[in-house]
Structures are given as structure tokens and as C-alpha cells.
């Protein structure tokens, strides 16, 4: 089934382009049309890729994938209220958490 909305808008815009004499108006209309076409084609391509991926490749179940996905931590989209425990965990794990410059041995003869 063909969507007639883009065809209708193109016909309307072509008639406006023919009837207008100002360059700025025509350039504005042309830029809006090209933006609409680019956004629409990118959206339909993404939808097509998602549909073909979901229908052709079904996830296979095995113990490695399940354990890997269970143990894997997500490092994207961390909410603000969960950021403090992550930093506290990093404080105990890495050198900047337990680094004390006064506890290091002093070299003899160092000025």
C-alpha cells in the first residue's frame, strides 16, 4: 500500500514553487522538503533493518550466552542516583581510592 501523503505534499510544494517569486521562500521550502525526505527515508530504513533482524535471526539459547548476559554490567544510561555507589565501588577497586602519599617510604638522602 502506497502512502499518498508525500506525493500530495510534493504536488503542493511544486505549485507553491511555481507561484512564488522570492528566492528565500523557495529555498526555505526546498530545505524543508529535503529534510522531510531524508528523515523519512532514514526512519523507514531503520524500521526495515529492525524488522528483518527480528524475523530472520532468533536468539539461540545456551548456557554461555545466558551467564554472560547475567554477569555483564551495563555501562550506558546510568541514572544519577545510582552513580554514587558506582563511584564508591571504583574507590575501593582502583589506585585513587586507597592511595596515601604519606604512607610511602621516604628515600634516604632525598631533599
Swiss-Prot record:
<keyword id="KW-0325">Glycoprotein</keyword>
<keyword id="KW-1133">Transmembrane helix</keyword>
<dbReference type="GO" id="GO:0055036">
    <property type="term" value="C:virion membrane"/>
</dbReference>
<protein>
    <recommendedName>
        <fullName>Inner membrane protein H108R</fullName>
    </recommendedName>
</protein>
<keyword id="KW-0426">Late protein</keyword>
<keyword id="KW-0472">Membrane</keyword>
<comment type="similarity">
    <text>Belongs to the asfivirus H108R family.</text>
</comment>
<feature type="glycosylation site" description="N-linked (GlcNAc...) asparagine; by host">
    <location>
        <position position="65"/>
    </location>
</feature>
<keyword id="KW-0946">Virion</keyword>
<feature type="transmembrane region" description="Helical">
    <location>
        <begin position="10"/>
        <end position="32"/>
    </location>
</feature>
<dbReference type="GO" id="GO:0016020">
    <property type="term" value="C:membrane"/>
</dbReference>
<keyword id="KW-0812">Transmembrane</keyword>
Amino acid at each position: 500500500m502506497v502512502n499518498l501523503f508525500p506525493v500530495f505534499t510534493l504536488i503542493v510544494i511544486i505549485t507553491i514553487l511555481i507561484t512564488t517569486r522570492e528566492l528565500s521562500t523557495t529555498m526555505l521550502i526546498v530545505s524543508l522538503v529535503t529534510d522531510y525526505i531524508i528523515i523519512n527515508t532514514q526512519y523507514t530504513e531503520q524500521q526495515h533493518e529492525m524488522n528483518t533482524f527480528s524475523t530472520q535471526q532468533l536468539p539461540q539459547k545456551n548456557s554461555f550466552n545466558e551467564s554472560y548476559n547475567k554477569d555483564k554490567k551495563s555501562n550506558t544510561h546510568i541514572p544519577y542516583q545510582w552513580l554514587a555507589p558506582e563511584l564508591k565501588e571504583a574507590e575501593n577497586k582502583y589506585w585513587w581510592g586507597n592511595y596515601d602519599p604519606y604512607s610511602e617510604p621516604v628515600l634516604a638522602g632525598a631533599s
